[in-house]
Amino acid sequence: ASLFNAPRV
């Protein structure tokens, strides 16, 4: 997983 792979919700 990448560092900016988290969904921004």
From Swiss-Prot:
Q: Keywords, A to Z?
A: Amidation, Neuropeptide, Secreted
User: What does the entry state regarding organ or tissue expression?
Assistant: Dorsal ganglionic sheath of fused ventral nerve cord.
Could you identify this protein by its name? Periviscerokinin-2
Q: Where located?
A: Secreted
Which one GO biological process term can you cite for this protein?
A: neuropeptide signaling pathway
Organism equals Musca domestica
Instruction: Relate the protein's function as given in its record.
Output: Mediates visceral muscle contractile activity (myotropic activity).
Family listed: Belongs to the periviscerokinin family.
Q: Name one GO cellular component term.
A: extracellular region
Phylogenetic classification of the source organism: Eukaryota, Metazoa, Ecdysozoa, Arthropoda, Hexapoda
Task: PTM Valine amide: list the residues.
Answer: V9
